[in-house]
Amino acid sequence: MATVNQLVRKPRAPKVDKTNVPALAACPQKRGVCTRVYTTTPKKPNSALRKVARVRLTNGFEVTSYIGGEGHNLQEHSVILIRGGRVKDLPGVRYHTVRGALDCAGVSERRQGRSKYGAKRPKS
């Protein structure tokens, strides 16, 4: 335990918590422009072609963002919104694309969990 004199000389350093989404800079979402849209393969033991986009954000960061849902309309120069949330089987992918916002269309024919994919309520 430190003495009072020691604490006067050198106060206790506050704990620094590390963020998992540094590019968001404490914002809930960030806007960016797609610089490359491509597919990549997941780690073992999974197998698929996962859709991802390389995005240049408004704050200058360049990050990789996962595009969830079946099918998408993104291409180079599309303006998208990203949020935090990593993809466990894709190393280096720490962000998700927000479907149904800006240039990214929602998932068509989506019936359940629609709010996560920007799909409107279907006409019954």
UniProtKB/Swiss-Prot annotation:
Assigned keywords, A-Z: Methylation, Ribonucleoprotein, Ribosomal protein, RNA-binding, rRNA-binding, tRNA-binding
Function: With S4 and S5 plays an important role in translational accuracy. Interacts with and stabilizes bases of the 16S rRNA that are involved in tRNA selection in the A site and with the mRNA backbone. Located at the interface of the 30S and 50S subunits, it traverses the body of the 30S subunit contacting proteins on the other side and probably holding the rRNA structure together. The combined cluster of proteins S8, S12 and S17 appears to hold together the shoulder and platform of the 30S subunit.
Modified residues (3-methylthioaspartic acid): D89
Keyword hit for ATP-binding: no
Record-given protein name: Small ribosomal subunit protein uS12
Family of the protein in this entry: Belongs to the universal ribosomal protein uS12 family.
Assembly, per entry: Part of the 30S ribosomal subunit. Contacts proteins S8 and S17. May interact with IF1 in the 30S initiation complex.
A molecular function (GO) term: tRNA binding
NCBIfam families: rpsL_bact
InterPro entries: NA-bd_OB-fold, Ribosomal_uS12, Ribosomal_uS12_bac
One Gene Ontology term from the biological process aspect of the record: translation
GO CC, alphabetical: small ribosomal subunit
Organism classification: Bacteria, Pseudomonadati, Pseudomonadota, Gammaproteobacteria, Alteromonadales
Protein's UniProt keywords contain Membrane: no
Any matching Pfam family: Ribosom_S12_S23
